[in-house]
């Protein structure tokens, strides 16, 4: 199987749609300014969150800045955003090499595509947003030290979604001891990333945000739950599951504590479960809507 990261981001749209905490989303909709908010999304990938916010009628008139360090993602977004926008009945105009204008009688959205490391972007950005979005991203960063820079990007609100919180479950069980070992070692690789990361970032954000004098307006679980219906996974969720196993393989295939043959057999068995529509995958995550208060947040 060919593994493409943009394809993975496409495949998890329906998974994320279900997972996003709807109470936190309702709080966002109640607080987001109605008149042309400026939104910055860091680690934005190919722009799936922008599409979601349009589909869900969360934004109509907005300036939306997509920031991602992977050139592959930004290039894909540049082609894909006009495709789905046109399919949704919107007109699309390109403005230079890195801007898109999506519009009709209801929508007027200016999109800026920024290929940049998030910390480089923080250093040069001097126009704070009304809303900062970090979707499935904070658990990849050093915490809590990254938060002050991130919060400098918003004058008021931050929507921090799908923050992993230490629970990964594959069902049915293959080998209880091996399943637990693989989960433990995989979580440990998150904690040991050279670039930072935290396998329990969800629960830890409560304390981190409090220490910054940021007000948590809403918080709740946003678990990924993927299972087949009638032996078939919805949308492209089978590809999503294969990619999750690919993450495990890439992270653990040379781990000194893990028996190589046992792990290879485990991966093969889990892939067979996907083929037969038997695999259930659950990952526990947390969403937050946060209000920045005063200068302590910067």
Where are these regions (language model features)?
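Class I SAM-dependent methyltransferase Rossmann-like catalytic core
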Residues: 1-34, 46
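A conserved beta-strand element that flanks and buttresses the S-adenosyl-L-methionine
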Residues: 133
